[in-house]
């Protein structure tokens, strides 16, 4: 397992319907609960090694973005955030979105409150 994942205290264990355990962060479990109502778990990628890496520029520096969730068969990347974190890092999030779309991916930001309510549509 990835050294970062092992040492990080911010990761949570999420048990998929098959019993496979995935390491997720923040509000990602809320998104997975929703996605598993529509997609098979094999169609939902969350492991860093299964995700595309998007290079983006912010403040004249090239950075690497590892998406939260990727659904390859529909080419959709989903970024999962709390409203507070999304707004706090607004310019970075917009840069990630732009470069992800420029790479040809569909892109959605899913914002949740603490009670697992998805805020739709989310307006800044």
Report residues per predicted region.
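Nucleic-acid endo/exonuclease domains
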Residues: 1-124
């Amino acid at each position: 397992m990835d050294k970062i994942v092992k040492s990080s205290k911010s990761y949570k264990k999420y048990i998929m319907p098959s019993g496979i355990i995935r390491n997720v962060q923040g509000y990602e479990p809320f998104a997975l609960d929703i996605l598993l109502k529509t997609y098979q778990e094999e169609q939902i990628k969350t492991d860093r090694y299964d995700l595309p890496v998007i290079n983006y520029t912010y403040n004249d520096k090239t950075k690497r973005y590892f998406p939260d969730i990727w659904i390859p068969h529909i080419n959709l990347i989903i970024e999962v955030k709390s409203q507070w974190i999304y707004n706090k890092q607004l310019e970075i999030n917009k840069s990630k979105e732009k470069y992800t779309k420029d790479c040809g991916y569909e892109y959605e930001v899913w914002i949740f409150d603490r009670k697992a309510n998805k805020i739709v549509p989310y307006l800044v």
